[in-house]
Design a protein with these regions (language model features):
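Short acidic-glycine-tyrosine-enriched beta hairpin
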Residues: 77-91
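Short strand-connecting beta-turns/loops that link adjacent beta-strands
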Residues: 36, 58, 102-103
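A short, N-terminal "cap"/entry segment at the start of jelly-roll beta-barrel domains
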Residues: 1-39, 52
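Conserved short histidine dyad/triad with adjacent acidic residue
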Residues: 41-56
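Ligand-binding loop in jelly-roll beta-barrel domains
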Residues: 91-103
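Glycine- and acidic-residue-biased ligand/ion/polar-headgroup-sensing regions
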Residues: 58-70, 75
Length: 103
C-alpha cells in the first residue's frame, strides 16, 4: 500500500498550529492527512477558537468530538456538540465549528 496510512495516533506534541483556520477565530492545532480523495484530520480547537465557515466543494467531512463542548452551524442551522457527538457535512454543504466552552 505504499505511503497510505491506516492508523492515526493522537499526539498533542506532534500537532501543527493553524492560525485563523478557514477564517476562524484564534487557531486550531491539528495533524492532517490527504490521499487525493479523502482528507483526515485530528486536532484541537481551543476555548474561544473556531474553524471559519466554508463549503465542502469536493469532499465531505465527519467530525467526531472526543472531549469538550461547542457547536457547528450547518447550512444556517445551529447544532450543539459534546463528547461523543458526530457531525457530518456532505459535499456541497457549508459549516463552521466553534468551541464556546472552557475546554
Amino acid at each position: 500500500m505504499g505511503d497510505i496510512k491506516m492508523i492515526f495516533e493522537y499526539d498533542e506534541n506532534n500537532l501543527e498550529k493553524y492560525k485563523n483556520f478557514k477564517g476562524g477565530e484564534k487557531y486550531i492545532e491539528a495533524k492532517m492527512y490527504f490521499d487525493g480523495l479523502n482528507r483526515f484530520m485530528i486536532g484541537h480547537v481551543p476555548s474561544g477558537g473556531s474553524v471559519g465557515e466554508h463549503v465542502h466543494e469536493t469532499n465531505s467531512e465527519i467530525i467526531y468530538v472526543i472531549s469538550g463542548n461547542g457547536y457547528v452551524i450547518y447550512d444556517g442551522q445551529r447544532e450543539e456538540l459534546h463528547k461523543g457527538s458526530v457531525h457530518y457535512c456532505p459535499k456541497g454543504h457549508k459549516h463552521t465549528m466553534v468551541n464556546d466552552h472552557e475546554e
